[in-house]
Amino acid sequence: MEAPERIPAPSEWHPFIGGAARTVKLWLAAVLAGLLGAAATQGFRTLIKGVEWLATGHMGGLVAAAESITPLHRALLGAFGGLGAGLVLHWGLRWAARGPDGAEHVDYIEAAREGHYLLNDRTTLMRSISALLSVGTGASIGKEGPMVQLSAWFASWLARFLPLTDDERNAILVCGIASGIGCAYHAPIAGVVFVLELALGFFARHTIAPVLIAAGTSSALIYWLVEPQPLYVMPTVALVPTSLGVAIAAGVISGGLGWAFIEMLERARKIFGRIDSLPFRLGLGGVIAGLIAAAVPDVWGNGYSVVSEVLQGNVAWHWVAV
């Protein structure tokens, strides 16, 4: 007769119960990180619209706002927006230098890679305000970067107050990054893959489930708050036998043009880097961008609407070059 299966004594249940409780606690924290990430990105979008309305009296998108004002108005907004962003950074870095973390900015990707969870509060706040002024007045720096930074910052604050281990707190920071990317680009899966593989460089066992939960939570909330549309309007393309050759040629040409554009950006960065004064440096950049916008209002913003027009075949190549 076989011996009956041994039932663990209650005193032996604690390790299993404790492990399950820690896992559930981390998952609930990931839900909170996702909610905060959605709030951060949507809040930043709202603030951008507020700055846009104050600057132009329009809230229907940056390109539409640029087209609704005069060329002189566009040029002045570029100059004053750049100057304002520079002044915020100039005074903000002085204020940050008096804080406990100094004026050295902590990049959220580097913090995640190194297993940390603390970010520099003052530099993060000042950079976000500076970006808000720039984006709201038409600068083409992109709003997605500050959104992800704010989402990571909110997650960092959440991790500080929860009874977690340092590894779990770092996982919550990673959750904030994934939530921000998912909300900013309406692509939660891309946010998960970017953080776990491209940013961290590995799939950490204890972060996979929380990151999936956070990205899903933030995207669900964003989809409930707004009705996200595809970033680009894709046309219907009929494939023919020569399509593959055209695609290969376009890839080679685009790769070369992309390399040349990056080289131009690096050279411009070095030239502007010689200017020590942040207000003057950003103000000068704003003047140049404003003068271009005075002639071509489509350069306002990060180019989503223009790229969609290009995909539809409604924009000539010389406007794309501008």
List where the protein language model places each region.
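Alpha-helical transmembrane segments and immediately membrane-proximal extracytoplasmic
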Residues: 1-322
